[in-house]
Amino acid sequence: IKKVLGPPGTGKTFTLLEYVDSYLEKGIPIDKIGYFAFTKKAATTAKKRMIKKHPEYKQTQLKYFQTLHSFCFHTLGLREENVMQPEHYEDLGRLSNIRSDNNKRLRITEESNGYLTSNSEYFQVINKASVKDIPIQSEFNTNEYSRKLDYQILKHLEVNLANYKDKNKLIDYTDMIKKYIKEEDKSPTFEVIFIDEAQDLSPIQWQMFDVLLTKTKDIFLAGDDDQAIFTWAGADVKRFIEQPAENQFLEQSVRVPKVVQEISNVILSRIQGPKIKK
C-alpha cells in the first residue's frame, strides 16, 4: 500500500495518473487497473485526463475509472430504477409524517458519494449511522443533534425506511457498498487499484477497501487529512491517517499562493487530533 499525500494543488491526481502510466508501460491491461475516486467529479476528471493523454483509449475501455459506488453498481448488475431517489425519501417522509426542521418542504438528497443531505435531522441520523455502520441509537447518543429529536420517532422511521425499500425493491448508496462486501465473489480482480480523495471515505467504504485489498496486488491511496470535509457526514479520516502504508509527500502547490498556505497552516496547527506528518 502506498499513500500519496499533499495539500491542495500539489498534484495528487497527476501523480496517481503517472503511476497508472507506469503500470501500462509494464504491459498491464487497462481493464486490470481500477481508478476509484470519492466524487463523481474527480472520477470524471481522471478519465478525461487519461483520454487526453492516451487518445488510443475510448471511454468504454476506462470502465474502472469511476466512483466506488459506480463500481458497486455495475459489479452487482444493478439498474437505475433500483436506486433510492430524492422523491422516494420525500414520499417516505410524508408517509411517516416527518417534517423538515424548519417546517418547510422536506428536502433530501443522497449524493453519489453516499452521504445524505437533508433539512430533517431524522434522515441525517439514519444515514450517518448507516455509513458509520453503527446502530442508530449509538449515533443518536453522540449528542450532535437537536434536543427536539425524538428517539422513538427516529426508530419508527428507520423501520419504515427498511420496509419502504423492501416493498419497492430499492437500495441506497450505502446498501450498494454493503451488498458488494457481502457478494465480494462477484468482484473482478486487478493488478493495481488507485483510490483518490481517500480522506473522505466513510467506515463502510473502508470496509470495502479491506475487500479490495484482497482483489489486487498493489493499491495506492491519495488524499490530505487537512482536506477531510465530510467528517460531519461520517467520514473516517482517522482510518486514513492510521492506515499503514509507504508515504509519499508532495510539497509544492501550483494552486495555492504561498501567503494563503502560510495562513492556513496557522489555523490547521490549532486543530486537535492525529495528523499525518512528514
Describe the predicted segments one by one.
Residues 1-6, 14-15, 32, 103-194, ...:
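Accessory N-terminal region flanking or inserted into the helicase ATPase core
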